[in-house]
Amino acid sequence: MTPRTALGALHIGALMFGLTGVFGKLAAASPAVIVFGRAAFAVLALAFFARFASQHGWQKLQAVDWRRLALSGVLLAGHWVSFFLSVKIAGVAIATLGFASFPAFTVILEGLIFRERIRANEIVLVVLVSIGLILVTPAFDLGSGATIGLLWSVLSGLLFSLLSLTNRASSGRIPAVQAALCQNVVVALCLLPVAAPQLSEVRALDWLWIALLGVFCTGVAHSLFVASLAVIKARTAAVVFAMEPVYGITVAWLLFNETPTPKMLLGGALIIVAIVVSARMSGHADKKTVAAEAASH
């Protein structure tokens, strides 16, 4: 794969990740069913990639690895359920922008968990995200469905941040595809008791959207990221990954006529700038960490 091809694959992967909220809105099913189906189809796609395309062998897992993968799988399940709840309540644009607040949570949690000193530019990042969220908030009223949806998406961002830090603590030993596959198995098992009674009611068309969500927005997108990281720098991949909200909001605008207000556009711009700046600042991020983060959305 040439650098130009790899960069194109990264953008296609980011576009697929950006379509997550779109397919979630198209599927007329509960968030529990959507997340269960997404995880189940993702397991199939990732298993295919691991079998035929991955250059990394299957790592034998120890007890500590299983515990970390189980924890990260539970966090991933919570992240996805809260995100799709936000999509159903408030729409794709608000859900995507609320989730995009995760770099601010990461900065704060890194200081608390890893005892890392928060730098001045990271404080600016937190301020940018905070102002962006204030501007994106439809109304400061908990009786507003859109505001409740935004809160669900912010919770999704918090859980994603915790998941990223969990992956960071355990990255390096387990190949990214293997870790993603195991995490999706945990997600499917977590949601199975809730989703099982509803599965017979899901229409064929909705299964199509869920399958696309699991195969393309999870399995194929993650596989493209992993393949392109062979020739692309981790920081470049992180910056491209930061464009995911732009793709998602643009498609939602075109498909669902979710026209953002000028205030929402300004808030979204601040949040996206914060994500790009965060990605460029992450000099310590290695390729396995970036791949793990990509798999988690």
Question: Can you say where each PLM-predicted feature lies in the sequence?
Answer:
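C-terminal transmembrane-helix exit sites in multi-pass transporters
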Residues: A50, F102-V127, I134, V246-L266
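Hydrophobic alpha-helical transmembrane segments of multi-pass membrane transport proteins
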Residues: I12-L19, F23-L26, F49, A70-L85, ...
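Glycine-/small-residue-enriched transmembrane alpha-helix faces in small-molecule transporters
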Residues: M1-A40, L44, L71-V74, S82, ...
